Curated annotation (Swiss-Prot):
This is Small ribosomal subunit protein uS9. It comes from the Bacteria. Residues 128-137 have a biased composition (Basic and acidic residues). GO terms for cellular component: cytoplasm; small ribosomal subunit. GO terms for biological process: translation. Belongs to the universal ribosomal protein uS9 family. The lineage of its organism: Bacteria, Bacillati, Actinomycetota, Actinomycetes, Mycobacteriales. NCBIfam families: PRK00132.1. The gene is rpsI.
Length: 152
């Protein structure tokens, strides 16, 4: 009662590795938000150039902390010299815009190379920071600051 099934040789196609620079036919576009800032990011294969509202990274963000914050996702996945970044930033201040740009870059890197997702997720670059300014309440001077209290 033993039946023999014919064994079929299956040719395995070469697996596609994403470690080489991922080629895409058009720019990757993503959006990053933080506080009141909204940033639209375009990721293009290139040499690591930043174009933020027509200015360089150093001109737009003179603060080295903000520059480091923005480059962090690219450094994490070791693609600092692989892509050019064109971004339109509006709303908020420097800190909010830097955070929004970081989120937009991280989201674009995932679209470009899905294998980078675990590293970026672990580093916390894919989480939208929900903190925003608390509204002022009536009867108070600011969001939580009460007027001076006098016992007598």
């Amino acid at each position: 009662m033993t039946e023999t099934t014919p064994e079929v040789e299956v040719a395995v196609e070469a697996e596609v590795t994403y470690s080489e620079s991922f080629v895409f036919e058009r720019p990757i576009q993503t959006v990053g938000r933080r506080k009141e800032a909204v940033v639209r990011v375009r990721l293009v294969p290139g040499s690591g150039k930043f174009d933020l509202n027509g200015r360089s990274l150093e001109a737009y963000f003179p603060n080295k902390v903000h520059q480091q914050l923005i480059k962090a996702p690219l450094v994490t996945v070791d693609r600092l010299e692989s892509y050019d970044i064109f971004a339109l930033l509006h709303g908020g201040g420097p800190s909010g815009q830097a955070g929004a740009l970081r989120l937009g870059i991280a989201r674009a890197l995932i679209v470009a190379n899905p294998e980078d997702r675990p590293a970026l997720k672990k580093a916390g670059f894919l989480t939208r920071d929900p903190r925003a300014t608390e509204r002022k309440k009536y009867g108070l001077k600011k969001a939580r600051k009460a007027p001076q209290y006098s016992k007598r």
